[in-house]
A protein has these predicted regions:
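N-terminal basic, amphipathic alpha-helical segments
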Residues: 1-84
Length: 84
């Protein structure tokens, strides 16, 4: 799956911030392509063994920072042009 590379079990700080950081790094390195759809919050939570709230907070931070966007009834997508 798309988030198979994520490993946030070990580390310091809030889990949602570690998830956010790893997704951001994956986008910048090209592992996750621009325009690509992220797994639903429910799917990502199940895959990563995290709460839905944790995944939702990470996704919301991605949107606030301009890395992702939420499209109603479609899901979360990596922006075509990442804002800095």
């Amino acid at each position: 799956m798309l988030l198979d590379f994520i490993n946030i079990k070990n580390g310091e700080g809030a889990v949602y911030l570690r998830l956010y950081g790893q997704i951001t790094a994956a986008v910048k390195s090209g592992i996750i392509k621009q325009g690509e759809k992220l797994p639903s919050i429910r799917e990502a939570a199940a895959q990563l063994n995290l709460s839905r709230t944790t995944v939702e907070n990470a996704y919301l931070k991605l949107c606030i920072e301009g890395t992702a966007e939420s499209l109603p009834q479609r899901g979360y997508f990596i922006r075509i042009k990442i804002m800095k």
